[in-house]
């Protein structure tokens, strides 16, 4: 009997143990299944979160959450906030630690780390997600209890997110004395409030049309093209703050005025091509620069120094992302970056010299450069005709743009950046290299009768022509004073092509000038000399010879510096001093040519006598370059001057005016050069 009980209890214990083992195993499997299913649900949710599939995310929210926020509100909130802070590269990483089991309340909690890039800086934070087991649409699964802190940390119901961009101040461009060439000013945007405009009187609308020079039909079209009922401001014009029309417009029903700061160019037309202008970034520019932090609403340098030094002038924007309560009171700064203002650009340009020269060129098609012949500092780079760059900043109508773009004098063309045939202003170079190579001497004379000459019959009908026959032999001094083409054609032939090219290239032909502004390279030819006629023509600055006004000025600086060409500088920080080219001609040659250039200005028969300023000793050369495609035709003529003051040289000017035929040739420039030197050196 005792044995029987022992067997009974043994069996009972074994069976009971097996029962508990099976129960535990079942319970454990069920719990692990819940944990794994919760993990799977949350992993899916975080993946959709990173992909910004907000509509799909909403389907995984708990029933309780869905009672507090609609799908439309949920999606809209994420889109608006993430869009406002420019969220991208969103990564949500669940932080799973070992086995997961529901708590006593049946819920499961997961921590996660969210990182994202924003327009301010990257954001990273950890959060906690609570999941509940529910049945929705006949599907039992784990769903997320959502709240606003999922969007940004510490965010609560009713809170808002404010994202502000802090725009940098664009660096000023100033001249050598600190005078602003590009700065900022306050302007006023004139806009239509569609709702109020519809109630405005026809008389009032006509007055707006008249004041702003905008057809009433165009104003009506702008309003009708706006379909959004929430639009309260349609910009129609921008005016300077001191514009007298603003007072009248302020009183007009249906209009709204807003102030803003914009780029401003005080010297307007006078510096337009040098300084350039800024404008709204276009799609092509944006695509190239979007990785550098540019936005579609940014302005960007469009031309000139504004474009060349865009990176330095622009700076970088800052911004703030803050959480506020429903009343707008700030609660928490989520991210902040201070704006980095653009760096200033200080030039060697003298704004007063620039303005003076521009006034002399105004109403002509031409260009000029001015330098300090001893230091190489660039004092002026001038272009005419020009345009007011402020018109591009304020906004230009299609009609205004068409008038500017189709102007036959091409005001948008940057002439000082282009190469032109220098004509007789090239002759001092031929003289210098001829003397240096011993191909000519100061005493050598040519004996040619009449106005025309050719080497021999192999030239066919082609002849070199000079302006006057002075009735006798012509030596170097007379050739420069009288500007004799035949003398310099013969001098070039005497040197020969190899020597002519070798010596001329010492002056910097076919090289980029060492300044941070793109200019054409001056050249002696396009693709070598085709024949000796071209060589002869090149001796007096025709043929295929082209020079920029600045390069011509630098070449002439050699006559003020014993045969050395100064190092040019456009930026104050780049003032190098010294020489760009040394010993381009021997000192004795320099002295000889320089004395002849003085006679060009002082001799009663000198071609530059009309520009001489009493009390200022000047050295220079005039030139007339003829532009024609073939012999026999009458081409356009450009008039040139290259001149500097001799004693304590402070100013060297090169100037070219187009189409001077029938107006006196280079003498069109006489009075202009005289006034420039008088104003700059004597007043």
Could you say what each language-model-derived stretch is?
Residues 28-33, 43-46, 60-65, 115-119, ...:
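Second-shell loop/turn segments in exported
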Residues 77-80, 84-367, 387-411, 419:
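Extracytoplasmic/periplasmic proteins that interact with beta-lactams or build/remodel peptidoglycan
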Residues 670-683:
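Short, gly/Ser/Thr-rich active-site loops of penicillin-recognizing serine hydrolases
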Residues 51-68:
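Short, well-ordered alpha-helical segments enriched in acidic and aromatic residues
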Residues 368-373:
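Short hydrophobic alpha-helical segments used for membrane anchoring or interfacial signaling
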Residues 6-47, 51:
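Short, low-complexity N-terminal intrinsically disordered segments enriched in polar/charged residues
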Residues 1-5:
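Positively charged n-region of N-terminal signal peptides that target proteins for export
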Residues 324-334, 374-424, 429-657, 665:
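Beta-lactam-recognizing serine transpeptidase/beta-lactamase-like catalytic domain environment
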């Amino acid at each position: 009997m005792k044995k029987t009980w022992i067997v009974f209890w043994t069996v009972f214990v074994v069976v009971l143990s097996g029962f508990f083992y099976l129960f535990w195993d079942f319970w454990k499997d069920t719990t692990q299944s819940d944990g794994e299913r919760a993990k799977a649900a949350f992993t899916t949710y975080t993946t959709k979160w990173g992909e910004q599939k907000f509509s799909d995310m909403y389907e995984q929210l708990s029933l309780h959450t869905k009672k507090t926020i609609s799908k439309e509100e949920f999606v809209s909130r994420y889109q608006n906030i993430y869009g406002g802070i420019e969220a991208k590269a969103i990564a949500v990483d669940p932080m799973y630690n070992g086995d997961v089991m529901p708590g006593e309340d049946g819920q499961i909690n997961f921590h996660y780390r969210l990182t994202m890039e924003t327009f301010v800086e990257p954001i990273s934070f950890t959060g906690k997600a609570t999941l509940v087991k529910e049945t929705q649409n006949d599907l039992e699964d784990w769903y997320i209890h959502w709240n606003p802190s999922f969007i940004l940390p510490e965010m609560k119901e009713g809170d808002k997110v404010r994202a502000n961009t802090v725009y940098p101040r664009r660096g000023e461009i100033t001249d050598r004395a600190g005078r602003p060439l590009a700065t900022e000013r306050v302007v006023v945007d004139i806009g239509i409030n569609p709702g109020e405009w519809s109630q405005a009187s026809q008389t009032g609308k006509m007055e707006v049309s008249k004041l702003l020079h905008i057809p009433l039909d165009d104003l009506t079209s702008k309003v009708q093209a706006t379909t959004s009922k929430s639009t309260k401001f349609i910009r129609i014009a921008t005016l300077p703050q001191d514009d007298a029309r603003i007072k009248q417009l302020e009183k007009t029903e249906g209009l709204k005025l807003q102030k803003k700061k914009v780029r401003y160019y005080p010297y307007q037309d006078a510096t337009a091509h040098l300084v350039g202008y800024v404008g709204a970034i276009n799609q092509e520019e944006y695509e190239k620069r979007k990785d550098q932090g540019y936005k579609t609403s940014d302005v960007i340098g469009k031309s000139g120094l504004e474009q060349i030094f865009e990176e330095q002038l622009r700076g970088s924007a800052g911004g703030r992302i803050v959480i506020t309560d429903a009343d707008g009171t700030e609660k928490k700064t989520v991210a902040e970056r201070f704006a980095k203002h653009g760096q200033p650009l200080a030039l060697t340009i003298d704004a007063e010299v620039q303005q003076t020269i521009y006034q002399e060129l105004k109403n002509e098609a031409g260009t000029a450069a001015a330098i300090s012949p001893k230091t190489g500092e660039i004092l002026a780079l001038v272009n005419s005709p020009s345009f007011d760059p402020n018109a591009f900043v304020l906004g230009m109508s299609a009609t205004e743009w068409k008038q500017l773009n189709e102007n036959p004098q091409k005001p948008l063309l940057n002439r000082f950046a282009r190469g032109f045939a220098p004509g007789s202003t090239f002759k001092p170079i031929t003289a210098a290299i001829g003397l240096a190579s011993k191909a000519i001497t100061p005493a050598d004379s040519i004996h040619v009768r009449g106005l025309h000459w050719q080497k021999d019959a192999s030239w066919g009908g082609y002849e070199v022509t000079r302006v006057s026959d002075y009735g006798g032999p012509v030596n170097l001094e007379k050739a420069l004073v009288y500007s004799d083409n035949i003398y310099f054609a013969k001098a070039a032939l005497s040197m020969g092509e190899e020597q002519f090219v070798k010596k001329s290239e010492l002056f910097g032909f076919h090289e980029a000038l060492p300044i941070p502004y793109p200019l054409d390279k001056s050249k002696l030819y396009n693709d070598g000399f085709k024949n000796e006629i071209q060589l002869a023509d090149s001796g007096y600055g025709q043929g295929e010879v082209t020079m920029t006004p600045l390069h011509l000025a630098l070449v002439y600086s050699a006559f003020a510096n014993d045969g050395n060409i100064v190092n040019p500088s456009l930026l104050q920080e780049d003032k190098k001093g010294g020489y760009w080219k040394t010993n381009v001609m021997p000192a004795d040659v320099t002295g000889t040519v320089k004395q002849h250039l003085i006679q060009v200005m002082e001799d009663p028969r000198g071609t530059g006598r009309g520009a001489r300023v009493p009390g200022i000793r000047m050295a220079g050369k005039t030139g007339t370059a003829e532009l024609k495609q073939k012999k026999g035709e009458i081409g356009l003529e450009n008039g040139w001057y290259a001149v500097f003051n001799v004693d304590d040289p402070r100013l060297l000017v090169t100037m070219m005016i187009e189409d001077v035929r029938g107006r006196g040739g280079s003498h069109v420039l006489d009075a202009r050069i005289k006034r420039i030197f008088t104003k700059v050196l004597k007043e």
